[in-house]
A protein has these predicted regions:
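Noncatalytic alpha-helical scaffold of FAD-dependent oxidoreductases
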Residues: 2-546
Length: 546
């Protein structure tokens, strides 16, 4: 809690979220429940893609008719099953259609595969045996972690064998001096973070799906998340990887060294490769010390220019203690209040066009409180912000974060949502949202009684990552044609990237040319051909079809 002197300086300006104003905080907000296999069947059918039953929902192959099953891949045979049964326990093999349903479908119920077999190895050696056999016998494979992806990268397109890392969930070692953690790829991110918390450390990434996503999947998709501003991307925090190549070769590079200047840094090839070059089975990652002093403030501002001004000043005045700088617009918080907050509570006294959530973390509370106080006072004096609250305990800390983390779930409550994850230069960040609203409005598709209820923008100002969501009643070809490929053309025109942290999968692979040159795509194809000449690893994704 802020000291009495600090609190006195802030009274009448930024409100401390203490006992007197506790009712103003969204204490009744329902923190989004992490997805799990057990919860899959009860997750709202309206979420994201479809209100249809699984039997009526179209297969991914039908939704992407340009994709054709490769004739070079074999169909699964009894001989193949006999081999898998010879190396795996019966509980690690699933052929039951009902059991496979949760693994053939993504959690958004947008992508639906047709796999007849799921394998759940528990060791790297078993993964090696499986991939060698599949490569020798031309059986396509889809690696799957927690299945929390958003672009269809972790589910089959046709009848590929699903190789789940769920049984590979052991922590192998932790060095309390260096902070180097070595673990299996199937470890759940939140489990790792809780383990490190007991040691005084923290995972360098944090995601809304942390209760279900696997660290191997995080690495394979180069997941970003809420801590990237402070700790950087996985390209910097991953120290080493254990990867099984398509031919079964085990690439043992689980180094815990901070510095190793011998040869090519091969692990970087697999970070963000989405399971197309091999399967990550082990991860060595550098975990930073957990901060002893953490503050969270939610601020209301009147324009995106003021959001930028607040961010610039935070880099100048909060610098080394700044750990997150998130923004969301009024449409975002309105959806959260409508769908996730009991009693329509608002953390601030009135609505604002934009909101900023700032987190600081450090080792000296008095020092951090003083810096944050000076920063907030300056914003108020210069009329950069109009209102705000500062969390005073762990519950309020979580409640303020729950607003930001609840936006994706709230967007889905209208029936479905179109999701775009873009890297855009901050000065034109919000122009994308405004242009898309104008485009849909001109087409007569935007409004409570129209196809699209609202367009919302939120994301990570600190790394230029915009989450552009369209909350709609249902999927519509008319809406899709208005959004695509315009959203990618706009991004390319402003020197952005069509995928900031969600990856490419089956959804964005046809649009890769908006972010990468022909020569770069050709080099990617050559790398793919070199490491996976038979093309068995996660086919039909990542790279555009020729």
């Amino acid at each position: 809690m802020f000291s009495m002197a600090t609190a006195a300086r802030l009274q009448g300006h930024i409100r401390l979220a203490g006992a007197r104003s506790l009712q103003r905080l969204p204490s009744a907000i329902k923190t989004p429940t992490p997805l799990s296999r057990a919860a899959f069947a009860t997750f709202p059918k309206a979420a994201y893609a479809s209100t249809a039953s699984a039997e009526k929902r179209p297969f991914t192959a039908d939704k992407f008719p340009h994709l054709k099953r490769s004739e070079s891949f074999k169909k699964l045979s009894d001989k193949d099953l006999d081999f898998f049964k010879s190396i795996l326990a019966p509980s690690a093999i699933s052929q039951d259609e009902g059991d496979l349903e949760a693994f053939n479908n993504d959690w958004m119920q947008k992508y639906r595969g047709q796999s007849k077999l799921m394998l759940k190895p528990s060791t790297t050696e078993q993964v090696s045996q499986i991939l060698k056999y599949c490569n020798d016998n031309m059986l396509a494979v889809v690696p799957q972690g927690g299945n929390t992806g958003l672009v269809g990268g972790g589910v089959p397109v046709f009848d590929e064998i699903i190789l789940s890392t769920a049984n590979m969930n052991s922590i192998r070692s932790f060095d309390a001096l260096s902070g180097a953690l070595v673990c299996d790829a199937g470890c759940i991110l939140e489990v790792l973070d809780n383990y490190l918390a007991e040691q005084g450390y923290i995972m360098p990434l944090d995601l809304g799906a942390k209760g279900s996503c696997h660290i191997g999947g995080n690495v394979a998709t180069n997941a970003g998340g809420l801590r990237l501003l402070r700790y950087g991307s996985l390209h910097g925090t991953v120290l080493g990887l254990e990867v099984v190549l398509p031919d079964g070769t085990i690439l043992d590079n689980l180094s815990t060294l901070r510095k190793d200047n011998t040869g090519y840094d091969l692990k970087q090839l697999f970070i963000g490769s989405e399971g197309t070059l091999g399967i990550v089975t082990g991860v060595s990652i550098l975990s930073p010390k957990r901060s002893k002093a953490v503050n969270v403030a939610l601020l209301g501002v009147s324009s995106f220019e003021q959001v930028q001004a607040a961010y610039k000043r935070s880099r100048d005045e909060l610098s080394e203690i700044l750990s997150a700088f998130e923004f969301f617009d009024q449409a975002s918080i309105d959806l959260v209040k409508q769908h996730l907050v009991a009693g329509n509570n608002d953390p601030l006294e009135s609505s604002h066009p934009f909101y900023v959530l700032i987190e600081t973390s450090g080792s000296n509370k008095d020092h951090d409180d003083e810096k944050l106080t000076n920063y907030l006072e300056g914003l108020l004096t210069d009329e950069i912000v109009q209102d705000g609250v500062v969390a005073q305990d762990t519950t309020q800390f979580k409640n303020l974060w729950a607003i930001r983390e609840g936006i994706p779930e709230a967007c889905s409550k209208s029936g479905t949502v179109y999701k775009y994850d873009l890297s855009i230069p901050v000065p034109v960040f919000y122009q994308m949202v405004e242009d898309m609203r104008a485009r849909l409005d001109k087409a007569g598709l935007l409004g409570k009684d129209k196809e699209v209820d609202c367009v919302v923008g939120f994301g990570h100002i600190g790394d230029g990552n915009l989450h552009l969501n369209f909350a709609a009643k249902r999927y519509s070809e008319a809406v899709t044609n208005i959004i695509e490929p315009y959203v990618y053309e706009w991004t390319a025109k402003h020197a952005g990237s069509i995928s900031s942290e969600h990856g490419l999968g089956v959804f964005k692979s046809p649009y890769l040319h908006y972010s990468k040159s022909p020569s770069m795509i050709q080099l990617m194809r050559r790398i793919k051909t070199m490491l996976d000449p038979n093309g068995i690893m996660n086919p039909y994704k990542y790279l555009p079809e020729k």
